[in-house]
Amino acid sequence: MHSDELLVEILVEELPAQALLNEYKEMPKKLHALFNKRALEVGNIEIFYTPRRLCLLIKDFPLLTQETKEEFFGPPVKIACNHQDKTQGLNALGLGFYQKLGLKDHQYFQTAFKNNKEVLYHAKIHEKEPTKDLIMPIVLEFLEGLNFGKSMRWGNVEKSFIRPIHNICVLFNGEDFSGIEVKEYGFKTKQATKVHRQEGFDFIQVDSPKAYFEVLEKNHVILDPKKREAKILQEIKELETKHHIIVETDRDLLDEVVAITEYPSALLGEFDKAFLKLPSEIIITSMKENQRYFATFCQKSQEESPTLHNGFIVVSNAINKDKQKIILGNQKVLKARLSDAVFFYENDLKKPLDNAPLESVVFVQGLGTLKDKMERESIIAQYLTQKYISSLNMPLEKALELVKRAVQIAKADLLSEVVYEFSELQGIMGYYYALKQNENELVALSVKEQYLPASENAPLPSSVFSSIVALSLKLDSLFSLFSVGKIPSGSKDPFALRRLSFGLLKIIAHYGLEFDLKADLKNLFQKVGVYQSFDLEILEKFLLERFHNLIDCNPSIIRSVLNTNERDIVKIIQKVKALKRFLDDPKNAQKKELLFSAFKRLANINKDRNPNESSEFSTNLFKEPKEHALFEAFNAIKMNAFESLDSKIEAYFGLHAPLEEYFKSVLVMDKDIEIQKNRKNFLWGVYQSFLEIGDIKEIAI
């Protein structure tokens, strides 16, 4: 037998769910790195967790390490030997090399060739050794390498960890790992585990992985988080069927309740229907954030959206048979929470949105207050309203009035009691307060949707009107933060400007709005007129970089379009997609090399040209028939008013044949300087015309 099953359990006090879930994804990679470091080839690594334990399971863990060879290369023989002659013995430099390796005289004078030079050399063979001696050092190094964000010390221990560690149980090949003193964390190891607290508090001896799993299963500990999740979902499904409800199984919440339970049970509780007068988002958020409850909805017809039901799902870790007692306890706690929410909500309704003291809240140090931000956003919103009035289906005067009002009250809910309690409800509460205070519905909805999209695949604002308010917020944040040097770098993006920029591009693309990243940014910067001066090209470049996340295609195609003067967001996307369609077309996919060979040569000829250089040429200086042929084909394209971008691209790429013929028979670098210049100018004109679509030299096929 060359391998056996290895199980390691690290017994801890309750681990914080979010910290555990974040680091759990990195654990297999970190463990593999430690094994590779010691040249250990292991089978599949499984890592299980409950709130009180981390368990590492490897089905095929080798009994012995591999025999390895470690090579050491020293100085060249010429400078390491007396009189530069290896028959004359080693000098101080040569002796020093071997002495550092702890070698004796009779082992001197091994040499090898490296980089065509003979150098001093030694190969150290590491014999096979039992892996049992490596397990504890690896486990301790693994624990030290885990990053949960925060750690603590307890007693007089040497090392810190996220929570106190009480035992490390190692089960491998019948070896005895008990009684090992772990000074770092202040305990001696036991070949034992602990079970569900309601089953007992004492250690239970285990002598094999099989016995370990049997003890946990018998004592209400489901070690595998996937099995705990499956149990929760199955019980929720049964409750849905029995009570004719729909349960919203929020992914993040599901992960969290799996992480805080060892033997989960899904139970249905109820709250007073009177609380349903609250906006549903308050109830759902209160249940999720404060109590880790799942919301339930009334089951209606497929045509109707489900409405919130006065129930909730609590996932209990108790193995108490009296489930009703658990439910009643949770109902009592939720009642108190929702009573608080009613109090906050009713207090907020008494305060007019107009009177929110925005001037008392600093936006960002150096960028004024929320009132200052609101005033800047208002100027941007007025500009965008005039620009997009044709998409708003209302008179300009009315649109300007409504947009101004929307921006004026958009931040008022930030000072509300509900948002103070649940910051994720910003905008949403503003919507409800606006409706209650008889604001225009478009205005109220735009307040709700101003922060959209919240993530890459999240919903967008539902109208152009809401989009104007959302874009105003995003543009002001970008201008403001860039103007004071708060520019994302590396992985640091404290104000989430990358996500915000992506959302800005996505909104504009979705509604097909005209927005030029050079002209409109400059116009807005000047129109607002209060931002600190900074290079707008930095912001332009930052936004252009986001296109690589926005469009799913060959990055070189995106780069080719961005390398032109095109800065209209929608047109950039249209050109990228049109180029992608052309290159993905089966009839073109087979001849990409042929299509691009002439264009690449055209690009190389013009690579050093000044973009502002003249492209004037005269057909009177054409001497070769192929010059005229290329000119006629090119001129036909220039004169054509193409119905679509696709047909224009098709026509331009159709120039590859006359271009190939041109390069075969025409010497661009003619001895006659005037003819040479004319030919170069002509080809420069052809190349510049391509730049109306993309820079062909950037496309990698």
From Swiss-Prot:
<dbReference type="GO" id="GO:0004820">
    <property type="term" value="F:glycine-tRNA ligase activity"/>
</dbReference>
<protein>
    <recommendedName>
        <fullName>Glycine--tRNA ligase beta subunit</fullName>
        <ecNumber>6.1.1.14</ecNumber>
    </recommendedName>
</protein>
<keyword id="KW-0547">Nucleotide-binding</keyword>
<dbReference type="GO" id="GO:0006426">
    <property type="term" value="P:glycyl-tRNA aminoacylation"/>
</dbReference>
<comment type="similarity">
    <text>Belongs to the class-II aminoacyl-tRNA synthetase family.</text>
</comment>
<keyword id="KW-0030">Aminoacyl-tRNA synthetase</keyword>
<dbReference type="InterPro" id="IPR015944">
    <property type="entry name" value="Gly-tRNA-synth_bsu"/>
</dbReference>
<keyword id="KW-0648">Protein biosynthesis</keyword>
<dbReference type="GO" id="GO:0005829">
    <property type="term" value="C:cytosol"/>
</dbReference>
<keyword id="KW-0436">Ligase</keyword>
<dbReference type="GO" id="GO:0005524">
    <property type="term" value="F:ATP binding"/>
</dbReference>
<dbReference type="Pfam" id="PF02092">
    <property type="entry name" value="tRNA_synt_2f"/>
</dbReference>
<dbReference type="InterPro" id="IPR006194">
    <property type="entry name" value="Gly-tRNA-synth_heterodimer"/>
</dbReference>
<keyword id="KW-0067">ATP-binding</keyword>
<comment type="subunit">
    <text>Tetramer of two alpha and two beta subunits.</text>
</comment>
<keyword id="KW-0963">Cytoplasm</keyword>
